[in-house]
C-alpha cells in the first residue's frame, strides 16, 4: 500500500545517525537525502537503503530545505522533514499513515510533531526540552521555512494540528562534535539577535507573548532575552529549576550545564557583534 508520504532528510556526514532515520521511515513512498558535501559513508548508506541521494551546496538551514521543497521531484501529497539524528516512533508512523491515506479525514494543512531527546543515553523529559514541538508534516506546496540563520520554523498556508506520536532525537557523533555544532549555532543565534535589535526582523514566525508555545518562545528570544544580564545563569535556573531538569537525574544536570555553556557562547558572540555594529 502506498503511504502518500515523502521524507526529506538534509545531511552532512551522517553515517552514524542515518541508518536509524532511514529504518524508521522505510514505510514512505519516497525518501530524499539532500546532502551538502558529505565525505563519509552517507552516500553509500543512501544507495544501500535504496533512497534518492541529491547533492546541493549548502545555502543555510532554511535555504537548503526550501531548495529541496522547490526542486526535488516529490510526488506524494504529504511531506515530512526529518533530521538525520531523528527517527520516527511506531506510534507516530501509524498516525502519519492514517492521515496520509485518508483513514482519518482532516482539514489541516500541517501538523506539529513532538520529539524527545536522548542525552548521555537517557530520555530527557524535562529541562525545557520536552515537549518540543516542531512543524514537520504538511501538505505538498503549502509550507516553507522562514529565512532565519538557525532554529528556523516552518510557515504553513492553512490551519495546523498537533500529533500524539513522537520523534526520537539522538545524535550519535559524540560530545565533542555536538559541542562544535553548538558553537556554530551560537554564532548564528548571536547574528540573529543583532538583526533584531538593529530593526531587521525576519518574515516568518511572529513573536507574541500571547500566542502559541513557539510564538511565546520567539517573543522571549527577540524582545526580552537580548536585554537581560547574566543570561547563562537565568538559563540554568529556567532549565534545571523551573522546568525541573533535576527530575532527569545526572543526565538532566549535565544537559543543563552544557546548555549554560552554550548560552555563554551566544552572549560572547552577541557582545562581539554589537561592538562591530557600533563601530
Role assignments for model-derived ranges:
Residues 57-64, 87:
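A short, glycine-/small-residue-rich helix N-cap motif at loop->alpha-helix starts
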Residues 36, 56, 76, 82-86, ...:
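Short acidic donor-binding/metal-coordinating loop in glycosyltransferase active sites
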Residues 4-6:
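Cell-envelope/extracellular polymer assembly enzymes that use nucleotide-activated donors
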Residues 8-27:
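Short, well-formed alpha-helical segments that are part of the catalytic scaffolds
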Residues 24, 35-44, 83:
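A conserved acidic beta->alpha catalytic loop
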Residues 63-66, 90-274:
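Catalytic-site signature of metal-activated, phosphate-bearing donor transferases
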Residues 66-78:
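Active-site nucleotide-sugar/metal-binding loop of Leloir-type enzymes
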Residues 16-19, 40-49, 91-92:
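Acidic helix N-cap motif at the loop->helix transition within catalytic regions
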Amino acid at each position: 500500500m502506498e503511504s502518500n508520504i515523502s521524507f526529506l532528510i538534509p545531511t552532512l556526514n551522517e553515517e552514524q545517525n542515518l541508518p536509524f532515520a532511514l529504518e524508521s521511515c522505510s514505510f514512505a513512498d519516497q525518501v530524499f537525502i539532500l546532502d551538502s558535501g558529505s565525505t563519509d559513508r552517507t552516500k553509500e548508506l543512501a544507495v544501500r537503503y535504496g533512497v534518492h541521494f541529491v547533492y546541493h551546496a549548502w545555502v543555510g538551514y532554511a535555504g537548503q530545505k526550501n531548495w529541496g521543497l522547490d526542486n526535488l521531484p516529490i510526488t506524494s501529497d504529504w511531506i515530512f522533514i526529518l533530521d538525520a539524528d531523528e527517527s520516527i516512533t511506531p506510534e507516530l508512523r501509524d498516525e502519519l499513515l492514517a492521515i496520509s491515506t485518508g483513514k482519518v479525514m482532516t482539514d489541516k494543512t500541517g501538523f506539529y510533531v513532538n520529539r524527545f531527546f536522548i542525552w548521555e543515553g537517557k530520555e530527557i523529559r524535562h529541562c525545557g526540552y520536552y515537549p518540543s514541538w516542531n512543524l514537520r508534516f504538511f501538505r505538498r506546496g503549502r509550507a516553507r521555512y522562514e529565512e532565519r540563520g538557525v532554529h528556523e520554523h516552518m510557515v504553513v498556508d492553512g490551519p495546523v494540528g498537533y500529533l500524539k506520536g513522537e520523534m526520537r532525537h539522538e545524535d550519535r557523533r559524540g560530545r565533542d562534535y555536538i559541542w562544535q555544532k553548538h558553537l556554530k549555532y551560537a554564532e548564528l543565534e548571536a547574528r540573529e539577535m543583532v538583526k533584531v535589535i538593529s530593526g531587521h526582523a525576519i518574515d516568518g514566525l511572529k513573536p507574541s507573548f500571547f500566542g502559541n508555545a513557539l510564538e511565546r518562545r520567539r517573543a522571549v528570544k527577540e524582545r526580552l532575552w537580548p536585554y537581560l544580564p547574566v543570561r547563562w545563569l537565568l538559563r540554568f535556573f529556567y532549565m534545571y529549576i523551573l522546568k525541573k531538569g533535576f527530575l532527569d537525574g545526572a543526565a538532566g544536570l549535565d544537559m543543563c550545564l552544557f546548555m549554560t555553556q552554550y548560552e555563554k557562547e551566544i552572549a560572547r558572540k552577541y557582545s562581539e557583534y554589537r561592538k562591530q555594529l557600533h563601530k
